[in-house]
Amino acid sequence: MTYDDSLLSDAHIHLSDFAARFLAAHDVLTIVSTATPEECKTARQLAAANPYVFVSGGIHPWHLPPKNDGGFEMINAINMVDILGEIGLDNVWCDSDLDEQRKWFSDQLKFAINSGRPVVLHIKGMEQEALEILRHHPNTYHVHWYSCPDYLDDYLALGCYMSVGPFPSIDPAVAAVAERTPLDRLLIETDGIDAVRWATGRDVSEDDYPATLVQIASEIAEIRHLTTEDVLRQTRDNLWRFIHSY
């Protein structure tokens, strides 16, 4: 079954040629994640033309500036975004210096609070440490693609929004997020077509993008004993609330 754009949402998609084309033609409520000043500018142009596109940006633990750089270009670009992120801590998928990660994470959390921006979090392998840091920086948080078997309830106790990606049926950690997150804090994300391909091991086409959002919703619906349309409506409403929490 197909669904109208007005029911669809994607809490986290990276800027790409496909994302730019799709969002120029569709009213899917979306947060476009950017990691460079150039991406921020492009995403801002998309957002200017589509009231359902919002921009996130920040210094990702995978892409820390050189120690003597200061990250000034990206810091200036962050002033253009609606939501800060994705930012966080990662000792699994990258070898960035952990002390530098901690510094940038804490500094950006403070900036988000001072500027009134909600935050998208990338946490991998450092869930417990990140949790302790977040407890000292109260804000509105979206934990993107949480894949740790532990600490989920602790993040939920902080009031975090949690997103379900591709797919609960193939990842027990994603299924746990779908099952245990309160309905009013549940979001849907793809992380982009390339991430869907990586997660599924399939050559997913760009034409499959809307169906991917619906499939995630359908799997949540089965877990929560709801209809797919109910889940699509709820997660879109939740994303709108998260975006406008600043």
Roles of regions detected by a PLM:
Residues M1-Y246:
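Mid-domain alpha/beta scaffold segments of enzyme catalytic cores
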